[in-house]
């Protein structure tokens, strides 16, 4: 099975012509302009290909018109769906950049070797991403900055962090 990468999540219908408002899950929302198609998985986890008719950058997201989604009702059915790209359309990563799908599920340890928890979510903020680490008792928010994240081992699903005072 091919690898697929989430590039956005449908948050709502936009207008009456079948457009969907998408929350980008990429740090380059303009990349939607370069996409010819996206994949959306159905309830049985089968991929369906949708050609992109056009894209508009809007406040708090991207407006996307998918071929075959022609009414507001069609668009509303996609609310909550992830727009995905296949591996041939994935962006090349820079050094120390990672796909969210590769980070989620990582076991997180302190520099001292203590198990902290599991990375369960990546929050996109203005300045830097924030990793949500689920411990036995609670969730901890860790800024995704080099002063905190000391090592990321994608192959072994392990992250090592230096906890700043107050975390």
From Swiss-Prot:
GO terms for biological process: ribosomal small subunit biogenesis; rRNA processing. It is found in: Cytoplasm. Residues 94-167 form the PRC barrel domain. Its main location: cytoplasm. GO terms for cellular component: cytoplasm; ribosome. It comes from the Bacteria. One of its GO terms (molecular function) is ribosome binding. The keyword Coiled coil does not apply. Keywords: Chaperone, Cytoplasm, Ribosome biogenesis, rRNA processing. Binds ribosomal protein uS19. Belongs to the RimM family. PANTHER family: RIBOSOME MATURATION FACTOR RIMM. HAMAP family: Ribosome_mat_RimM. The PRC barrel domain binds ribosomal protein uS19. An accessory protein needed during the final step in the assembly of 30S ribosomal subunit, possibly for assembly of the head region. Essential for efficient processing of 16S rRNA. May be needed both before and after RbfA during the maturation of 16S rRNA. It has affinity for free ribosomal 30S subunits but not for 70S ribosomes. This is Ribosome maturation factor RimM. It comes from Thermoanaerobacter pseudethanolicus (strain ATCC 33223 / 39E). The gene is rimM.
């Amino acid at each position: 099975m091919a690898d697929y990468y989430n590039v956005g999540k449908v948050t709502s219908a936009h207008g009456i012509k079948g457009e969907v408002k998408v929350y980008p899950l990429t740090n380059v929302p303009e990349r939607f302009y370069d996409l010819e198609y996206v994949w959306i998985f159905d309830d049985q986890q089968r991929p369906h290909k949708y050609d992109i008719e056009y894209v508009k950058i809007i406040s708090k997201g991207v407006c996307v018109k998918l071929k075959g989604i022609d009414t507001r009702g069609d668009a509303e059915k996609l609310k909550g769906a992830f727009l995905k790209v296949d591996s041939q359309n994935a962006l090349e990563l820079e050094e120390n950049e990672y796909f969210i799908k590769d980070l989620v599920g990582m076991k997180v340890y302190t520099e001292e070797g203590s198990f902290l928890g599991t990375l369960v979510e990546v929050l996109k903020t203005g300045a830097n991403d924030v990793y949500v680490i689920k411990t036995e008792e609670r969730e901890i928010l860790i800024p995704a900055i080099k002063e905190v994240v000391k090592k990321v081992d994608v192959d072994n699903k392990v992250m090592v962090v230096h906890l700043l005072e107050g975390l």
